[in-house]
């Protein structure tokens, strides 16, 4: 982690010479929970919920009674 912190405690986006403060490789892997993991879990949850809706829409189709 960089020791350069702003008045609110956040790390600045850029260093004084213009370079990024955090390397692009680490932007997706730092933090409490990696963003790619949250996005993957969210995507799976959306597919699951849509699957339940599609399953429910076809239940009873073709049933004679």
UniProtKB/Swiss-Prot annotation:
The chain crosses the membrane at residues 35-55. It is found in: Cellular thylakoid membrane. It holds the Pfam family PsbJ. Its main location: membrane. GO terms for cellular component: photosystem II reaction center; plasma membrane-derived thylakoid membrane. InterPro entries: PSII_PsbJ (IPR002682), PSII_PsbJ_sf (IPR037267). Belongs to the PsbJ family. PSII is composed of 1 copy each of membrane proteins PsbA, PsbB, PsbC, PsbD, PsbE, PsbF, PsbH, PsbI, PsbJ, PsbK, PsbL, PsbM, PsbT, PsbX, PsbY, Psb30/Ycf12, peripheral proteins PsbO, CyanoQ (PsbQ), PsbU, PsbV and a large number of cofactors. It forms dimeric complexes. PANTHER family: PHOTOSYSTEM II REACTION CENTER PROTEIN J. HAMAP family: PSII_PsbJ. This is Photosystem II reaction center protein J. It comes from Prochlorococcus marinus (strain MIT 9301). The gene is psbJ.
């Amino acid at each position: 982690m960089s020791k350069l912190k702003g008045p609110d405690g956040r790390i600045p986006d850029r260093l004084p010479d213009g370079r990024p403060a955090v390397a692009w490789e680490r932007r997706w892997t730092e933090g409490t929970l990696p963003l790619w993991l949250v996005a993957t879990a969210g995507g799976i949850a959306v597919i699951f919920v849509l699957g339940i809706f599609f399953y429910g829409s076809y239940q009873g189709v073709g049933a004679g009674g």
